[in-house]
Amino acid sequence: MISVNDFRTGLTIEVDGDIWRVIEFQHVKPGKGAAFVRSKLRNLRTGAIQEKTFRAGEKVSKAQIDNRKMQYLYANGDQHVFMDMESYEQIELPAKQIEHELKFLKENMEVFIMMYQGETIGVELPNTVELKVVETEPGIKGDTASGGSKPATLETGLVVQVPFFVNEGDVLIINTTDGTYVSRA
């Protein structure tokens, strides 16, 4: 059991018979009344996001998640195939279950597959990934310090806002948590 006062982003908990990952949380101490913790949770089975409020000091169960290192192989229709790096066992995950992660997955990329009591519940990406720009407007010559941005389409289909100096063919480092540009690789 873990106290809601000890919540941190990325923590995996068990609430109402489901497995949730803490996305955001905020400790609130109103002037009148008891303190509470407002949290935003992602259901690891369905991908649904729910806001939940807990009383300060309330206890919840910490879910024991096993991470298996796997390699993303390919998409097979609506299924995505991953291979265990040690046993060469292959598993398939439906696109609906890993919708957010698909924007960052490239073939042969190594990721962690999250397992809960023998059930595959999702993909854990690295904090950042390197993706190639396949389409963007050409930069304006000499415009390096204006601080503006333009949209760029990456090799996975993800569209991110990038600085004007980024060109087609550049490899960028992208934050997988919020899908934002970090830097050039």
Curated annotation (Swiss-Prot):
InterPro entries, per the entry: Elong-fact-P_C (IPR015365), NA-bd_OB-fold (IPR012340), Rib_uL2_dom2 (IPR014722), Transl_elong_fac_P/YeiP (IPR020599), Transl_elong_KOW-like (IPR013185), Transl_elong_P/YeiP_cen (IPR001059), Transl_elong_P/YeiP_CS (IPR013852), Transl_elongation_fac_P (IPR011768)
A GO term, aspect molecular function: translation elongation factor activity
Origin: domain of life: Bacteria
Main location: cytoplasm
PROSITE patterns: EFP
GO BP term, pick one: peptide biosynthetic process
Pfam families noted in UniProt: EFP, EFP_N, Elong-fact-P_C
Pathway assigned to this chain's UniProt record: Protein biosynthesis; polypeptide chain elongation
Keywords: Cytoplasm, Elongation factor, Protein biosynthesis
UniProt cross-references to NCBIfam families, sorted A to Z: efp (TIGR00038), PRK00529.1 (NF001810)
HAMAP family assigned: EF_P
Protein name from the UniProt record: Elongation factor P
Originating species: Anoxybacillus flavithermus (strain DSM 21510 / WK1)
